[in-house]
């Protein structure tokens, strides 16, 4: 009875090992009928009764996904870092030949109105704060050395102090 119990235990142990070891059931067509065969768990079916060892890394889809995400992140970060360190050159605009002429320090009496000049469109009249129409602020000089029109320089606001607050409020 002891030998019989040993044989049954060995048979059950063999069945247990065979059941716990995962196997792949593969098939392929040979003529019109399918042919079945079994591969081990770490092997892939190749088609004609052959089993090929599969790399376990091929089954790790999340590994490949994270690897591709890491590559894309590194490429994107490198692109933005490169753009910040080496900005693209600015588009060159055509150069304008503009020359300024200074007004004479002591103009002839009556040639210029008192008060700061107000710059307007070259084709339209200028208005001073009082409401009087004044001559064009831009004076065209046809004999300019650059061939273009020349205009007086803009007034320098930095050299004069701002008006007092009471005067600004009173003018409004």
From Swiss-Prot:
Subcellular location per UniProt equals:
Cytoplasmic vesicle membrane; Late endosome membrane; Lysosome membrane
- Gene source species: Mus musculus
Print the keywords alphabetically: Cytoplasmic vesicle, Endosome, Lysosome, Membrane, Signal, Transcription, Transcription regulation, Transmembrane, Transmembrane helix
Which ranges make up the Extracellular topological domains here? 23-60
MF terms from GO for this chain are: enzyme binding
Q: What is the lineage of its organism?
A: Eukaryota, Metazoa, Chordata, Craniata, Vertebrata
Family under the similarity heading: Belongs to the VOPP1/ECOP family.
Gene Ontology cellular component list: cytoplasmic vesicle membrane; late endosome membrane; lysosomal membrane; organelle membrane
Q: Which domain of life is it from?
A: Eukaryota
| Name of the featured protein | WW domain binding protein VOPP1
How does it sit in the bilayer?
Single-pass type I membrane protein; Single-pass membrane protein
- Those parts of the protein on the Cytoplasmic side are 82-172
């Amino acid at each position: 009875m002891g030998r019989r119990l040993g044989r049954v235990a060995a048979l059950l142990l063999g069945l247990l090992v065979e059941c716990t070891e995962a196997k792949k059931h593969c098939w392929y067509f040979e003529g019109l009928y399918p042919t079945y065969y079994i591969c081990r768990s770490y092997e892939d079916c190749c088609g004609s009764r052959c089993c090929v060892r599969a790399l376990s890394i091929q089954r790790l889809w999340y590994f490949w996904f994270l690897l591709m995400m890491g590559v894309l992140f590194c490429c994107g970060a490198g692109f933005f870092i490169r753009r910040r360190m080496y900005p693209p050159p600015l588009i060159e605009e055509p150069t304008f030949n503009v020359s300024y002429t200074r007004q004479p320090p002591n103009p002839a009496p009556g040639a210029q109105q008192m008060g700061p000049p107000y710059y307007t469109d070259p084709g339209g009249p200028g208005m001073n704060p009082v409401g009087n129409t004044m001559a064009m602020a831009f004076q065209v000089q046809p004999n300019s050395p650059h061939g273009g029109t020349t205009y007086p320089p803009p007034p320098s606001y930095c050299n004069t102090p701002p008006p007092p607050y009471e005067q600004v409020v009173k003018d409004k």
